[in-house]
Amino acid sequence: LALGQAIIESGWGQSRFALEGNALYGQWTTNEQRGLIPEERDDDKTHAVLKFDSLKKSVQAYMHNINTHGAYYSFRVVRRIAERVQYTDPISAKVKFLAAYAEIGDEYVDKLELIIESNKLRDFDRFEY
C-alpha cells in the first residue's frame, strides 16, 4: 500500500518533489519555507509540498500521517479489524478508505488499486527484513 502510494505521488520517483525534496508522498504544508511550491498551484491556494532531508524521513512522515491524522481514522479501524480476523486480502479492505489522501478522491483509490495489482505489490505485503 505504501509502495503504491509512493509510486503515484512521486511519479515513480521522478517528480520534481521527489528529486528536489525527497518527497515520496506529496504531503502538504502551509509553511512555504518547509516545502516546494507546486508550479501549477492555483492562485487561491497557499500550500507547498513538504520536503525532507532524506527518503527515510519522507517515509517516516508518511507513516506518522497515516497513523495519526483524523482523515485516516476509518482506514486504521479497518486495518485493525483485517489484522484480527486475518482477512485474506487486507489491502483491498483498506485502500477504499484512502480517498481523502488526494484531491481526486475515489479516482485516487481506483488508481492505487490498479498500481498495486498491475505491479504485484501484494507480494511485498508480508515482507520482513
Q: Model segments located where?
A:
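Catalytic cores of secreted/periplasmic lytic hydrolases that degrade extracellular macromolecules
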Residues: 1-3, 8-129
